[in-house]
């Protein structure tokens, strides 16, 4: 039979998931040179038309030796057809059950409860965003200021084309989720009846597949496309989820057509998402893309102090400085370190001081001692600027050596627990005031000179990788 031969070839051409979920359940019949394929619902037919009909047509013509010159895909409403019943066909259900279905995302335990979705107060399914994710509780610094300001601006011009979609990108644990949910919380506070939905890309896939299994695709589409604000976390994780990507594409377009706001997050800039459909990636760039960088040491200190204050914890500033010097990767690790310090303090029944902090972070200190040292920083900086190590450490004050030297001292202060005198000794026996001046100079140069700031960020990434 022609369709059986087509199935054999399609199994070779397509992924196992796509074949099992979308192709195997189709019913086929050949009528006067036309191969008719029947699908359970309109969504199914649209997916086949836009993704696989051309391939099926080519195979049908080849395998029939020209007998079949046209392939049609229709919703099966034939009398007595199993596909015309209110239930999904047994073969469809079986196929979906054998295909790997994403499991519900495991929610990390945070000090405050976190929910997956926020919808309007009219909804019968009333779930809330994390109430702690607000603008007032977000600590701003040079690394995230533009992203925070943009998110606040979105609230005043919801759906405006210049920032729709708003695409926040950067490494994990830097506050992208906090910012996007802050927009949702602020909107719901101002307009309690606004329809807001927050989901991860995994939960989008899960809900979509579930709607297919239960025959509730139209309900899923209606829920997603009637929003005022859609927030989707980790959009890059939709890669490889072909059917879900198609549905997200249509949802995305429908919301943009209605000038409804979309905010997405990813670990990379849109054009670096090469594993996603280029059409979708192109649309991600229609609005505004804003990067979020790892926080500098001043911001890390303020994050720790605010977190401690909100938790009713007395954290001395010198202890916050010490923690911030040791934990540099992201906000999540920073908060984890603080939680450990608080736990040790309570266990010992002692106030938080440097001894308690050092004991709490001994594992972190041991790892950092093996990986980031002043000597390591000097080597990386000298290689980056292609200058001899002896000149970086030496006495010459010419600009070609002085700027990299100041930068290296600033990095040493930020990334190691060494004191100013210790850093000075590592740089040819310079005194502590020279190191202090270098660190202050680095702060001012980063604000004044974009090239210097970019060099600093590049070196920070190299040393932290």
Curated annotation (Swiss-Prot):
Keywords assigned by UniProt, alphabetized: ATP-binding, Cytoplasm, DNA replication, DNA-binding, Lipid-binding, Nucleotide-binding
Keyword Magnesium: no
Start and end residues of each stretch annotated as Domain I, interacts with DnaA modulators: 1-87
Major localization class: cytoplasm
SUPFAM superfamilies (alphabetical): P-loop containing nucleoside triphosphate hydrolases, TrpR-like
Localization terms from the record: Cytoplasm
Annotated region described as Domain II, given as residue ranges: 88-127
Gene Ontology biological-process entries: DNA replication initiation; regulation of DNA replication
Region (Disordered): 81-123
One Pfam family per UniProt: Bac_DnaA
Residue sites binding ATP per the record: 173, 175-177
Start and end residues of each stretch annotated as Domain III, AAA+ region: 128-345
The keyword Hydrolase appears for this protein: no
Biased composition (Low complexity): 88-100
GO MF annotation list: ATP binding; ATP hydrolysis activity; DNA replication origin binding; lipid binding
Region (Domain IV, binds dsDNA): 346-465
GO terms under cellular component: cytoplasm; plasma membrane
Described function: Plays an essential role in the initiation and regulation of chromosomal replication. ATP-DnaA binds to the origin of replication (oriC) to initiate formation of the DNA replication initiation complex once per cell cycle. Binds the DnaA box (a 9 base pair repeat at the origin) and separates the double-stranded (ds)DNA. Forms a right-handed helical filament on oriC DNA; dsDNA binds to the exterior of the filament while single-stranded (ss)DNA is stabiized in the filament's interior.
Homology family: Belongs to the DnaA family.
HAMAP family: DnaA_bact (MF_00377)
Recorded domain comment: Domain I is involved in oligomerization and binding regulators, domain II is flexibile and of varying length in different bacteria, domain III forms the AAA+ region, while domain IV binds dsDNA.
Assembly and oligomerization: Oligomerizes as a right-handed, spiral filament on DNA at oriC.
The protein's name: Chromosomal replication initiator protein DnaA
Source taxonomy: Bacteria, Pseudomonadati, Pseudomonadota, Gammaproteobacteria, Moraxellales
Originating gene: dnaA
